[in-house]
């Protein structure tokens, strides 16, 4: 099974991707996580990608396509995966279809701009186990202590400020809305209300994928 999660920054793709991937025992591949891993390396590619991310701009198709192809052609993903954050535009979608021939399902997370901004600006994660929290909606039960592993160290995304987030949303709309129309005609496109809480969204996705 190959499932693509589409939606703007802060729509909840990463949270649901991890949950559903664990439930159906498939890898969760998040383009943003791949980029953040690359950025930590001392390479010219890392510097180039980091410059785009810091400015709230999308990384050029040629770079994105090559990075994602290198990952997806690994034998670790031969049985399927949940793909989060790719493709982002028509050119990427057609590149993806050029080397992936299996049937796919596309799930789009629909969320208002106002809620997206709060989700992104409030987002942080446990540095140890990567559990995601939000200063507006989902804080640890005990202050500064991770609910899952007990760690007291957290990561805050440096590229997340209101100006950059708003720009990322606008860039996303310009780039990705034509892709939504393209996939709507595929017969495998599904929309979920991303404004619901985590549990409700998870249930909606399980129904789409016909899993318990």
From Swiss-Prot:
The EC number(s) given in the record are 2.7.4.3
Range of residues in the leader sequence = none
* Reaction it catalyzes: AMP + ATP = 2 ADP
Q: What is this protein called?
A: Adenylate kinase
Where along this sequence does the record place binding of Zn(2+)?
126, 129, 146, 149
Q: Which residues participate in AMP binding?
A: 36, 57-59, 85-88, 92, 157, 168
Matching entries from InterPro entries are given as: Adenyl_kin_sub (IPR006259), Adenylat/UMP-CMP_kin (IPR000850), Adenylat_kinase_CS (IPR033690), Adenylate_kinase_lid-dom (IPR007862), P-loop_NTPase (IPR027417)
Which GO MF terms are attached to this record? adenylate kinase activity; ATP binding; zinc ion binding
Which Gene Ontology BP annotations are present? AMP salvage
Pfam (any one):
ADK_lid
Q: Which family does it belong to?
A: Belongs to the adenylate kinase family.
The free-text domain remark for this protein reads: Consists of three domains, a large central CORE domain and two small peripheral domains, NMPbind and LID, which undergo movements during catalysis. The LID domain closes over the site of phosphoryl transfer upon ATP binding. Assembling and dissambling the active center during each catalytic cycle provides an effective means to prevent ATP hydrolysis. Some bacteria have evolved a zinc-coordinating structure that stabilizes the LID domain.
User: What keywords appear on the UniProt entry?
Assistant: ATP-binding, Cytoplasm, Kinase, Metal-binding, Nucleotide biosynthesis, Nucleotide-binding, Transferase, Zinc
- A Gene Ontology cellular-component term: cytoplasm
Q: Where is this region: NMP?
A: 30-59
Q: What does this protein do?
A: Catalyzes the reversible transfer of the terminal phosphate group between ATP and AMP. Plays an important role in cellular energy homeostasis and in adenine nucleotide metabolism.
Ranges for region LID? 122-160
């Amino acid at each position: 099974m190959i499932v693509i999660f589409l939606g703007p920054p802060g729509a909840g793709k990463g949270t649901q991707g991890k949950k559903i991937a664990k439930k159906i025992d498939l890898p969760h591949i998040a383009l943003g996580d791949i980029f953040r891993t690359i950025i930590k390396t001392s390479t010219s590619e890392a510097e180039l990608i980091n410059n785009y991310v810091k400015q709230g701009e999308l990384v050029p198709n040629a770079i994105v396509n090559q990075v994602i192809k290198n990952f997806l052609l690994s034998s670790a993903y031969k049985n399927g995966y949940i793909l989060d954050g790719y493709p982002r535009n028509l050119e990427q979608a057609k590149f993806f279809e050029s080397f992936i021939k299996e049937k796919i399902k596309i799930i789009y997370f629909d969320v208002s701009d106002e809620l997206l901004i709060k989700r992104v600006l409030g987002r942080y994660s446990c540095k140890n186990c990567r559990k995601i929290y939000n200063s507006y909606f989902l804080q640890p039960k005990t202050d500064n202590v991770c609910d899952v592993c007990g760690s007291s160290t957290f990561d805050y995304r440096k590229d997340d400020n209101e100006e950059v987030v708003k720009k990322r949303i606008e860039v996303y709309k310009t780039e990705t809305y034509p892709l939504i129309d393209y996939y709507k005609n595929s017969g495998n496109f599904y929309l979920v209300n991303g404004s619901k809480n985590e549990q409700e969204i998870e249930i909606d996705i399980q129904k789409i994928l016909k899993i318990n």
